Amino acid sequence: MIPLSHGLGITIILFALGLLGMIVRRNFLFILLGLEIMIHSAALAFVVVGAYLGQEDGQIMYMLVVTLAASESAIALALLLRLHRYCHTLNVDSINEIVE
């Protein structure tokens, strides 16, 4: 079994990478991917803490979070397709200019 600090360190690194991906990239699809990485890293933290405490609650929460992330992803991709058909771009800055 891996130590708690190593598991939480990996989740923090994944969360930071997702946040960095959301901040740096201006493409709506990459922002969505960064958000998904952040959600899954938070869910992984549930599993790590649950394994450390010897409880199955972390794995149950992980399944719940993955289910919610899948539904959120499906809705976001539908909005992304609609946005691309309307604006012909996925660049967030260009979309902000069109709205103004």
From Swiss-Prot:
It is a multi-pass membrane protein. Its EC number is 7.1.1.-. It comes from the Bacteria. The keyword Cell membrane applies. Gene3D superfamilies: 1.10.287.3510. The chain crosses the membrane at residues 4-24, 28-48, 60-80. One of its GO terms (cellular component) is NADH dehydrogenase complex. Keywords: Cell inner membrane, Cell membrane, Membrane, NAD, Quinone, Translocase, Transmembrane, Transmembrane helix, Transport, Ubiquinone. It is an enzyme of class 7 (translocase). Disulfide bonds: none annotated. Belongs to the complex I subunit 4L family. NDH-1 is composed of 13 different subunits. Subunits NuoA, H, J, K, L, M, N constitute the membrane sector of the complex. NDH-1 shuttles electrons from NADH, via FMN and iron-sulfur (Fe-S) centers, to quinones in the respiratory chain. The immediate electron acceptor for the enzyme in this species is believed to be ubiquinone. Couples the redox reaction to proton translocation (for every two electrons transferred, four hydrogen ions are translocated across the cytoplasmic membrane), and thus conserves the redox energy in a proton gradient. This is NADH-quinone oxidoreductase subunit K. It comes from Blochmanniella floridana. The lineage of its organism: Bacteria, Pseudomonadati, Pseudomonadota, Gammaproteobacteria, Enterobacterales.
